[in-house]
């Protein structure tokens, strides 16, 4: 029965003179998302609102699921748009709306009118009271409850009158593409896909780098990361996934360096490679899924040691999260079941029994000097042989 959806947004509304840029970005993201749904749609801005008009038959659930993946949306409202033909006609339409949407009339309700068009002859409170009476007359089994109603009938007086009672939560945040671009270090674990989701929620476009270590990591491990990138791309839009062969670098570090420092030194070289691809792709920073104290490589001292090799900012959106908070988001975005598939990534092989938790940078520098020029050649080979997989959003 719905021919339109009203799209609610929050943060965009408090922007100043450049608000229209954020609105235009949101319209663009909505149009992109609706390509996943059958049907024809028109996305338009009108009086500080965004509407999705359906121009053909469509699947309601498909449309809602597509819109629920668009950052910047806080509410999706199936809406009936009415011409202003006077209050009595409006009341008739509201009663007809209730008949279709609420076959069981045993509910409590309130009317929430908003008079955006100030030349309408009735005040908002008058509309609330008069419409409440009309509903009670038509359906005596209903009751008014202005504090904890089961149903809220929203009536917005605009160029057309908007009537809706369902607000489906959106993901919030900012439209992707409004806050630059960054490179995500994506592994097969739980944390990094959530980090990608969280940074995209702030309007950041992302690409990704994955470190593959065949034959120690399998093709199934690689496919798992591709699948995780697809999950993140549902929200972030298209991702270019850089698959880096890290085997020779990892083996050489394992042979040349003290094992308690393996994790830190390997991560430093991962950061160097990720930064190379970030700069190549005009990214403004790196993103990791690290959280303080979660594992030995994520102590404050360890994070400082990996930061040292980077010339661009490293963003860690999960830095203060505990594991259960991260798991909850992973489950919400349908990444958890993929993340826990039992395929090892390169961070879980060659693990020291007693890794250093407070690395001494002077010691790290001395150990890295032992790697000499050979490590530079191996790094260049990894750059030259990178595989780029385009993931559609």
Give the residues covered by each predicted segment.
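Structural beta-sheet core signal
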Residues: 184, 208-210, 243, 288, ...
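RNA-binding accessory domains that recognize and position tRNA/RNA substrates
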Residues: 1-183, 193-240, 308, 356-361, ...
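Conserved G/P- and acidic residue-centered "switch" motifs that form tight phosphate/ATP-binding loops
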Residues: 189
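A short alpha-helix-loop-beta-strand transition element characteristic
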Residues: 334-342
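A conserved beta-strand->alpha-helix junction
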Residues: 229-255, 345-346
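The feature marks non-catalytic terminal segments
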Residues: 341-393
């Amino acid at each position: 029965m719905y021919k339109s959806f009203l799209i609610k947004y929050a943060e965009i509304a408090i922007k100043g003179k450049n608000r229209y840029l954020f609105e235009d970005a949101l319209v663009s993201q909505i149009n992109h998302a609706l390509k996943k749904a059958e049907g024809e749609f028109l996305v338009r801005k009108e009086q500080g609102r965004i509407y999705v008009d359906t121009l053909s038959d469509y699947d309601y659930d498909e449309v809602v699921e597509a819109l629920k993946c668009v950052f910047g949306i806080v509410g999706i409202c199936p809406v009936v748009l009415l011409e202003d033909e006077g209050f009595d006609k409006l009341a008739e339409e509201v009663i007809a709306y209730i008949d279709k949407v609420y076959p069981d009339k045993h509910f409590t309700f309130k009317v929430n009118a908003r008079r955006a068009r100030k030349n309408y002859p009735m005040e908002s409170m008058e509309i609330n009271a008069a419409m409440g009476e009309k509903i009670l007359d038509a359906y005596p089994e209903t009751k008014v409850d202005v504090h904890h109603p089961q149903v809220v009938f929203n009536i917005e007086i605009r160029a057309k009158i908007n009537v809706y009672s369902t607000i489906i939560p959106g993901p919030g945040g900012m439209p992707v593409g409004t806050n630059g671009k960054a490179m995500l270090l994506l592994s097969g674990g739980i944390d990094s896909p959530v980090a990608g989701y969280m940074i995209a929620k702030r309007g950041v476009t992302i690409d990704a780098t994955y470190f593959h270590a065949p034959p120690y990591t399998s093709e199934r491990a690689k496919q798992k990361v591709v699948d995780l990138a697809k999950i993140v791309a549902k929200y972030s839009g298209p991702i270019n996934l850089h698959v880096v062969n890290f085997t020779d670098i990892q083996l050489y570090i394992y042979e040349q360096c003290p094992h308690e420092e393996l994790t830190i030194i390997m991560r430093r070289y991962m950061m160097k490679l990720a930064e190379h691809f970030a700069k190549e792709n005009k990214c403004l920073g790196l993103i990791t899924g690290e959280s303080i104290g979660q594992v030995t490589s994520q102590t404050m001292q360890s994070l400082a040691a990996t930061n040292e090799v980077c010339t661009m900012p490293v963003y860690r959106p999960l830095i203060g999260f505990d594991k259960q908070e991260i798991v909850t988001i992973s489950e919400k975005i349908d990444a958890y079941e993929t993340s826990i598939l039992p395929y090892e990534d390169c961070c879980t092989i060659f693990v020291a029994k007693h890794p250093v938790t407070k690395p001494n940078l002077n010691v790290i520098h001395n150990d890295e000097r032992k790697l000499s020029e050979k490590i530079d050649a191996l790094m260049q080979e990894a750059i030259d042989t990178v595989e780029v997989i385009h993931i559609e959003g």
